[in-house]
Amino acid sequence: MSNRVIIFDTTLRDGEQALAASLSVKEKLQIAMALERLGVDVMEVGFPVSSPGDFESVQTIARTIKNSRVCALSRALEKDIDAAAQALSVADQFRIHTFISTSTIHVESKLKRSFDQVLEMAVSAVKYARRFTDDVEFSCEDAGRTPIENLCRMVEAAILAGARTINIPDTVGYTVPSEFGNIIQTLFNRVPNIDQAVISVHCHDDLGLSVANSITAVQHGARQIECTINGIGERAGNCSLEEIAMILATRKGMLGLETGINAKEIHRTSNLVSQLCNMPVQANKAIVGANAFTHSSGIHQDGMLKAQNTYEIMTPESIGLNRNNLNMTSRSGRHVIKHRMEEMGYSEHDYNMDALYEEFLKLADKKGQVFDYDLEALAFMEAQAEEDNHYQLQQLVVQSDSTEGVATATVRIEVGGEIKTEAATGNGPVDAAYNAIARATDRRIDIISYKLGAKGVGQNALGQVDITAVYHEQNFHGVGLATDVVEASARALVHVMNLTCRADKVADYKQSMQKNRELGGV
């Protein structure tokens, strides 16, 4: 048996079912091209019979993708299979995936047929699909709750009819790993023609076991895993592609299995899917979460600086990230602060480590995470332990034209003790407010990240805006809180403005310090 596991991605079919709004054809094509770069073997990209839009997107992707096999879903009905075949006909290589329910509850309650009738429908569907391609996949929907005798009969009949891949879905995420592994093992033991097909699994995450069930399945002989980027999908989601890929890569010595996934594309693909689908990845998500390679514990940080593999079983570079993160918090030790200062180019002779660490702990207790620009200010400007408020927002008035989409904002800002009033227009109220603030402060920065959230619950909740901005090639993080989202956005920008102002003062101090050194050395 081959040790190669086929990765079947269904982000654009099963994954899209979780979205509040469907993706456009262009967005689907973007994701499909990312999946091709990632190296998925098969991508299931839609259900052509369901709508003209789905048909168009499947056809467009099928025409474009060259290095992955493009697949479309169909029920065990000739009209579905016809639509799938027509949409896929422009592809270099394609697969038709047909399915029917096999569990007792589905057969009796949903299909209202006998199992024998359902078996005949499955056989007919597979045979019909074989008219269009040799690559036919058949799925036993709700296989996890199907009596094993019936499941064995269905699998044997589908293979005999011409299916080259047999998919065993845990459709409702009901099974546990030992149980699911036993199902796969029983199929290999009882189905006489099992060697004529690839056994696939498609596990849902209702009990949080989709990845564990999938790994157990390949340990028992399955050689295709159906999964999605970021684990998105119906209800609680699907098996996560990135987790499967990195489990098989990281534990290759133990599992003896491999995939064709280009792991360095994982982070990039995850971000793209998250953005286009408007589904943020939770911070503690395995592999691709913001905290996946972030270390806050002082003990962990110290270990990481001594040897990276003390607390990391894979590198961030392996999934396409540049580096891991050592968050500077009140739990960070002196070693971490010294290391960070060294990374920024400072030697211990440039600052007082004892004083810096004492001030660092005070600031960390107050604000939580401390950033590089905070550390520089603490090291070189004793009077700047508290954040400067060179800019203070006094008033913000916004007027919007709902028909034209143009907004006008007027701001009154205190700038170093002087009151300035400026007005500006923009593409929406936030853009207008930002333009007015930029005029008043005469300071231009580039916003690279804008996140809108809420602090509190119900009617008492405040809008919270978090922004990341670039100023002189350095990132600055600002937060704004207000009952109004536009005001919260403005306050976040003013927060960043104050941070950049302080950074300028630090830069001036460092420059004068360098000049003094040069003069002293003459």
Curated annotation (Swiss-Prot):
Which residue range or ranges hold the Pyruvate carboxyltransferase domain? 5-267
Sorted alphabetically, the keyword list is: Amino-acid biosynthesis, Branched-chain amino acid biosynthesis, Cytoplasm, Leucine biosynthesis, Manganese, Metal-binding, Transferase
Q: Does the keyword Transit peptide apply?
A: no
Localization (cell)? Cytoplasm
Q: EC number(s) on record? A: 2.3.3.13
* Cleavable signal peptide: none
Q: In which pathway does it act?
A: Amino-acid biosynthesis; L-leucine biosynthesis; L-leucine from 3-methyl-2-oxobutanoate: step 1/4
**What Pfam family does this protein match (any one)?**
HCS_D2
A GO CC term assigned to this protein in UniProt:
cytosol
Which parts of the sequence are annotated with region: Regulatory domain? Answer: 392-522
Listed cofactors? Mn(2+)
Q: Which GO biological process categories is it annotated with?
A: L-leucine biosynthetic process
Catalyzed reactions: 3-methyl-2-oxobutanoate + acetyl-CoA + H2O = (2S)-2-isopropylmalate + CoA + H(+)
User: What InterPro entries does the database record attribute to this sequence?
Assistant: 2-IPM_HCS-like, 2-isopropylmalate_synth_dimer, AIPM/Hcit_synth_CS, Aldolase_TIM, LeuA/HCS_post-cat, LeuA_allosteric_dom_sf, LeuA_bact_synth, PYR_CT
Q: Which CDD domains match?
A: DRE_TIM_IPMS
- Amino-acid positions noted as binding Mn(2+) in the UniProt annotation, renumbered to this chain: D14, H202, H204, N238
Question: Which GO molecular-function terms appear in the entry?
Answer: 2-isopropylmalate synthase activity; acetyl-CoA C-acetyltransferase activity; manganese ion binding
What interactions and quaternary structure are annotated?
Answer: Homodimer.
Biological role stated in the UniProt entry: Catalyzes the condensation of the acetyl group of acetyl-CoA with 3-methyl-2-oxobutanoate (2-ketoisovalerate) to form 3-carboxy-3-hydroxy-4-methylpentanoate (2-isopropylmalate).
UniProt record similarity statement: Belongs to the alpha-IPM synthase/homocitrate synthase family. LeuA type 1 subfamily.
Could you tell me which HAMAP family the record lists for this protein? LeuA_type1
Write the protein's name: 2-isopropylmalate synthase
Source species of the chain: Shewanella baltica (strain OS195)
Q: Which gene encodes it?
A: leuA
